[in-house]
């Protein structure tokens, strides 16, 4: 079923790309857009994961460079019956994480230094279990290809003003209307597809992630902390590349402009409530978890300690001492 949904979403994005090509260049523009879309789909299948990781300057780690983090992911992957994914760290203050890759055999998970430093080990386990659930559900191929195509569609819409109107239909009113439609429809169309990709998949990944890590409240507590952090700590790379926002466990965009108009993620409170209900049904007490999850905000556990001069954003002087340094 996931493969069918993937094919439908890729087809929808291709039709959107071709439609914009027609608005900008008539039949010729549509055919050029089709060729570009096919090439991008093929390229995205093989390389979109590498592009996203490179975009965020993700650093691959192993058991020697980040022992606790790597072993945690290894144990969770074993719990899920998955091959060991590649493990990455993103030097970014905002707590967040994502998974990518075309299949479980070629998957990667990435967490920010903000996530590893500010969350307890239990909460980190909940987050990484959620990302492995995306891998197991084969959501990662869809998310990475959609991120690539959505970015291209949005860019094409931005270029519409400079490319001019539909020359095949004349440079008059229709050309102007076509250009304006491309400029307006393209970014919103990309956002709508992102919403369709992310919202239902996040609930499924939350449920499966809770099963993988063994405690739904680890993940629910983590979601609350990440959501609060994302509101006050900007992720500049994500702000510059909003087409990748749906890949993260929590929307990394700060809400500037129209970011909150069409959210790429379901409401965090609803996700937390669903996880708490799952915990109650399995007999896990939230009070005991609260005491563990609300451990010191400056975590000095297996991820290392935050230095005294920390506090800037990822472009500033916030530095961490940990196994990835």
Curated annotation (Swiss-Prot):
It comes from the Bacteria. Gene3D superfamilies: Metalloproteases ('zincins'), catalytic domain. Its EC number is 3.4.24.-. The active site is at residue 131. It is found in: Cell inner membrane. One of its GO terms (molecular function) is zinc ion binding. It is a multi-pass membrane protein. Its cofactor is Zn(2+). Binds 1 zinc ion per subunit. Belongs to the peptidase M48B family. This is Protease HtpX homolog. It comes from Brucella melitensis biotype 2 (strain ATCC 23457). The gene is htpX.
């Amino acid at each position: 079923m996931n493969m069918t949904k993937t094919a439908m979403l890729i087809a929808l994005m291709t039709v959107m790309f071709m439609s914009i090509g027609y608005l900008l260049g008539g039949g010729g523009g549509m055919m050029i857009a089709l060729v570009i879309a096919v090439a991008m789909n093929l390229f995205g299948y093989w390389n979109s994961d590498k592009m996203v990781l490179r975009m965020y300057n993700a650093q691959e780690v192993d058991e020697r460079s980040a022992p606790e983090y790597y072993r945690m992911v290894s144990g969770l992957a074993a719990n899920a019956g998955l091959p060991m994914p590649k493990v990455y760290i993103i030097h970014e203050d905002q707590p967040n994480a994502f998974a990518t890759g075309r299949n479980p055999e070629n998957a990667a998970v990435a967490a920010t230094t903000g996530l590893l430093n500010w969350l307890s080990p239990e909460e980190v386990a909940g987050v990484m279990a959620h990302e492995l659930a995306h891998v197991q559900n084969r959501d990662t191929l869809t998310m990475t290809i959609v991120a690539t195509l959505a970015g291209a569609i949005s860019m094409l819409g931005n270029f519409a003003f400079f490319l001019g109107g539909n020359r095949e239909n004349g440079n008059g009113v229709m050309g102007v209307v076509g250009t304006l439609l491309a400029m307006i429809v393209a970014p919103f169309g990309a956002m709508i597809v992102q919403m369709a990709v992310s919202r239902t998949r996040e609930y499924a990944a939350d449920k499966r992630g809770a099963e993988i890590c063994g405690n739904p409240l680890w993940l629910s507590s983590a979601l609350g902390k990440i959501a609060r952090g994302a509101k006050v700590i900007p992720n500049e790379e994500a702000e510059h590349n909003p087409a990748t926002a749906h890949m993260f466990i929590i929307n990394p965009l700060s809400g500037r402009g129209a970011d909150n108009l069409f959210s790429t993620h379901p409401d965090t409170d609803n996700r937390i409530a669903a996880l708490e209900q799952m915990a109650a049904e399995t007999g896990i007490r939230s009070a005991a978890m609260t005491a563990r999850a609300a451990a010191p905000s400056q975590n000095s556990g297996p991820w290392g300690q935050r230095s005294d001069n920390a506090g800037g954003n990822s472009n500033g002087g916030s530095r961490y001492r940990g196994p990835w340094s």
